[in-house]
Structures are given as structure tokens and as C-alpha cells.
């Protein structure tokens, strides 16, 4: 079946291997609420990787070589074009320079979409460079001193602010520190970073909207888990993804095959 590729997903369950063959789906949904309950209504879902070979079979392919990270930004912007100004909440995999570059280009015509995501624990941001008091030769500095954000949980522990926030259906007491810094090699886009401590965990959240309240950023990211519930219901209640992409009539897959090897198909 077209689009099947070797995938990797971290797993702490011994019955689920980290490497497997399958389709890579990308989906977006709209978070709605009824009273205190929140739900994710699916809007779009498609295969976002592994279609290069099938597209070569036809002329005038409509599928470009953009990564699934960029495709997700485009899908979010299309939804925002229908619903109006929106926030796209993504996991930490999507904090990349190509994603932010695509977001900047799409928002040039009409600013409809902002992204809320999570940064890796090893994330490094940069201070905003200070203007020189006296003019100097050469171009102005694009970035200031680098900051390892993970070290701020201890170095600036006294600057954290406490707040009560609704997370995962219940009130949680969290501590947060909000900073506007530059991020991205050669991009140096100004982003809002929110360092969060709750229970025995910590996280670094990011927003492209510099005016958004840090508490709202934390609450919005907590709603991201609702799309995981949508995938679960789609599979268990409707039977989505319940298909086989292999058959005995097909030759066995050579797991050691290289890209330069000839195709096993006639």
C-alpha cells in the first residue's frame, strides 16, 4: 500500500516496539467546550509522508516535498482562514525553523494564525540585543547572549509566579516564569517562553503571540491532549485505522533495502 514507511515513536511499553512500519497521519481539530468539559472535533486528517514515489507515477503532482511539520502549519492556516484568528497548539516536535518560517510567510497576507507549542529541555534561546549607545561600523547584532532555558528553573527560582490553573479537568497550582527571547538559528524570531513547574514536573512552553497571557498559554497547551482522545475514539468507536497495509500476494518487505536498490515490485 502506498505511503507505508518505517516509523519511530518512543514507547515505554515492551509490547509496542519503538520502530514499526505504517502510515504517518497528521490531523488537526477544533477544541470546543460544553460547560466545564472540552472536546476536540476533527477538522482534517491526511497522510503526510511517504507519498513521493506514488506522486512520481502521475504528471502534475499536487503533493509537494514539504515536510509534515510544514504541512501541519499549512493545514492550521487553512482552518484559521475559515474560523478566523486562531491558535494552533502543537507538541514539541513542531518547534522548528522551517515551521516558523512557513508561519511567517503565511501570515504576511493576513495574520490569522499563532502557534503554541513546547520546547525541548535542551532548548537554547537568545537575549534581545541591546542597541549600542554609540554608532559602530558593521551590521547591528541579531542576537544577544545565549540562555540555556532549563537552567533557569534553579537559577531564577525566586522569580517564578504562583497561579491556580485548570489543567486536565482539575485545578492545579503551578509556578511559571515568562520571558520574551529570540530563537532559531539564522531566524532569531522573538517568541514568548513560559517555564512551568507543576507537581513534580516541569515544561518549557512557547507562543508566537507575544501579547498572550502566560496563564492562557499554559491552559491552551493542556487542551492539546484532547486530540489524543479524538484519535482513541476514532480507532475504538468508529474503527478508524483498522486496516492492513500488507497482503500475501505482495513480496516480503526487505528491511535492509537501500534507497539505491531496485524496487521489488514488477
Where are these regions (language model features)?
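Active-site-proximal, Lys/Arg-enriched surface segment
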Residues: 1-49
Amino acid at each position: 500500500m502506498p505511503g507505508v514507511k518505517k516509523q519511530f515513536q518512543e514507547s515505554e511499553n515492551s509490547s509496542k516496539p519503538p520502530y514499526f512500519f505504517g502510515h504517518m497521519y497528521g490531523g488537526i481539530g477544533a477544541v470546543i467546550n460544553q460547560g466545564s468539559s472540552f472536546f476536540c472535533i476533527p477538522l482534517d486528517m491526511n497522510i503526510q509522508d511517504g507519498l513521493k514515489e506514488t506522486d512520481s507515477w502521475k504528471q502534475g503532482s499536487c503533493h509537494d516535498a514539504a515536510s509534515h511539520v510544514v504541512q501541519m502549519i499549512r493545514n492550521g492556516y487553512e482552518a484559521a482562514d475559515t474560523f478566523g484568528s486562531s491558535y494552533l497548539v502543537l507538541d514539541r516536535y513542531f518547534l522548528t525553523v522551517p515551521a516558523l518560517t512557513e508561519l511567517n510567510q503565511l501570515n504576511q497576507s493576513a495574520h490569522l494564525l499563532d502557534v503554541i507549542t513546547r520546547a525541548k529541555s535542551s532548548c537554547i534561546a537568545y537575549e534581545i540585543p541591546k542597541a549600542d549607545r554609540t554608532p559602530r561600523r558593521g551590521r547591528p547584532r541579531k542576537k544577544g547572549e545565549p540562555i540555556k532555558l532549563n537552567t533557569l528553573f534553579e537559577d531564577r527560582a525566586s522569580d517564578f509566579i504562583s497561579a491556580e490553573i485548570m489543567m486536565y479537568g482539575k485545578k492545579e497550582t503551578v509556578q511559571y516564569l515568562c520571558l520574551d527571547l529570540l530563537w532559531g538559528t539564522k531566524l532569531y524570531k522573538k517568541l514568548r517562553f513560559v517555564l512551568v513547574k507543576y507537581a513534580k514536573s516541569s515544561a518549557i512552553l512557547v507562543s508566537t503571540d507575544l501579547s498572550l497571557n502566560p496563564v492562557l498559554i499554559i491552559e491552551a497547551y493542556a487542551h492539546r491532549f484532547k486530540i489524543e482522545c479524538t484519535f482513541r475514539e476514532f480507532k475504538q468507536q468508529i474503527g478508524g485505522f483498522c486496516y492492513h497495509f500488507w497482503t500475501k500476494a505482495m513480496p516480503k518487505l526487505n528491511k535492509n533495502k537501500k534507497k539505491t536498490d531496485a524496487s521489488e515490485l514488477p
